[in-house]
Design a protein with these regions (language model features):
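Short beta-strand edge/turn micro-motifs at domain boundaries
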Residues: 2-12, 37-39, 125-165
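Short, low-complexity N-terminal intrinsically disordered segments enriched in polar/charged residues
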Residues: 16-67
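Short solvent-exposed beta->alpha transition segments
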Residues: 46, 56, 62-63, 67-109
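A short hydrophobic beta-strand element
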Residues: 107-120
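Zn2+-dependent metallopeptidase catalytic core
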Residues: 121-126, 137, 180-232, 263, ...
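Zinc-dependent metallopeptidase catalytic helix centered on the HExxH motif
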Residues: 239-312
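Post-HExxH zinc-binding segment in Zn-dependent metallohydrolases
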Residues: 279-327, 375-395
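Pan-zinc metallopeptidase signature
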Residues: 324-397
Length: 397
């Protein structure tokens, strides 16, 4: 069963600042029945009879990419496709790919439909990990045509699969950009590395340390295309979950006119990676998912020193209901302000380590609000709600 869950992705312009919010898109891969004759078959899997030459070819090519063997990767590729495959090799190696695997899904000789699954450095690579689909024409053990698949995956097109990105390697962040944004790489990589220092602190709280973060810069055209074009005209950045394999971050730097805005958006989105990458968040926890990202993104400032104070309205509950579809700008602003102040209250009342332990137990371990509250704070969630609703009410205005 394929399950796609989305939340709002909007951008707010309040008090001269721009803040991106996450596009939380959780993708569960197709589960196949072992008795189903159309079942996906891993390339190189043990089968009865003589080895399949196409499976052997694809397995050898994937192995070459994983170990950084450019010659082995290009060996089965026709001359007309060598540049395309060389660019793809360089992109995936720049992203620190650690696992690559082909799965043949359909055969109509000489054409095969395949899925290329992949994982990057540090990721726990699950069987149902991220993947892209391709259509390959293979003649005499040579790939002569590579085309768009009949059924692309929900992630397609990924930022990297075109193979034309240029990369910068920061201390903590790998940043990829199309040639049109090459001139922004040095500036944004420096900002992202600085933001990552803050995000690393919260990843440690969450027990979700990241070997590296991945950040992609999009032009307006690519913004409407990457990851299926799920980003809206309102957003300037989003975190794209890759299931248990981690997450990517995409920003649209053309909509961010100041260094401060760039820093806040990147720090916010990497904050999502730090807190919820590798797990599936619940829609009802939107207040906490976005609230903690707001808290992280605004560091070292506290909520009352940000534009969110202007948008805060008197709360009725600590765990606010998720935004409704079609919410207007004022509703969006008030929701994110309340989430920010809610997390700020937890920090004010109990200290940052205990507040982040509550976040970890709720978002990563899926404890109930009451169980997470009792474990982290030593009191029930109703008491925490009363305390914070009162505190937040005094911050209004």
């Amino acid at each position: 069963m394929r399950d796609v869950t989305t939340t709002h992705d909007r951008v707010r312009h309040i008090g001269g600042f721009v803040l991106a919010v996450v596009v939380a898109i959780t993708v569960a891969s197709l589960v196949t029945d072992p008795d189903d004759p159309a079942q996906v078959i891993p390339a190189g899997a043990a089968v009865a009879g003589p080895p399949d030459p196409i499976e052997q070819l694809l397995t050898a090519q994937a192995t070459a990419l994983t170990r950084g063997d450019q010659t082995g990767w290009l060996k089965p590729v026709a001359p007309s496709l060598r540049k395309r495959y060389l660019d793809l090799f360089r992109s995936l190696r720049a992203l620190h790919v650690t696992t690559v695997d082909y799965r043949i899904t359909t055969r109509r000789q000489p054409t095969v439909q395949v899925e290329l699954s992949y994982c990057f450095v540090g990721a726990r690579c699950p069987k149902d990990g991220p993947k892209i689909a391709q259509k390959l024409t293979i003649k005499s053990n040579v790939i002569v045509v590579e085309a768009a698949a009949d059924r692309p995956t929900d992630l397609q097109p990924t930022p990297w699969e075109s193979g034309d990105l240029v990369f910068a390697q920061g201390k903590r962040v790998t940043v990829g950009a199309p040639p049109a944004l090459r001139s922004r790489l040095k500036e944004i990589t420096k900002i992202a590395d600085s933001a990552a220092v803050v995000d690393d602190r919260f990843a440690a709280y969450a027990g979700n340390r990241q070997p590296r973060y991945r950040l992609f810069l999009a032009t307006e055209k690519l913004w409407r295309s990457w990851y299926g074009g799920k980003a809206t005209n309102w957003a300037v950045g989003y975190m794209q979950p890759l299931g248990a394999a981690g997450a990517d971050v995409v920003i649209n730097p053309g909509r961010l006119t100041t260094t401060a805005a760039l820093r806040e958006v990147i720090q916010h989105e990497l904050g999502h990676v730090a807190t919820i990458a590798g797990v599936t968040s619940r829609h009802e926890d939107m207040w906490l998912v976005e609230g903690v990202a707001e808290y992280i993104g605004s560091q070292p400032r506290r909520a009352y020193d940000t534009y969110n104070r202007e948008a805060l309205t008197k709360p009725k509950a600590l765990a606010a209901r998720p935004l409704r579809d079609g919410a207007d700008d004022d509703e969006v602003a008030a929701f994110y302000a309340q989430g920010h102040f809610a997390v700020d209250c937890l920090v004010t009342a109990f200290g940052e380590p205990r507040a982040m332990e509550f976040v970890r137990q709720r978002l990563r371990l899926s404890l109930s609000l009451d169980d997470a509250s009792r474990s982290a704070f030593g009191t029930d969630f109703r008491h925490v709600t009363t305390t914070c609703v009162d505190w937040m009410s005094h911050q209004v205005g």
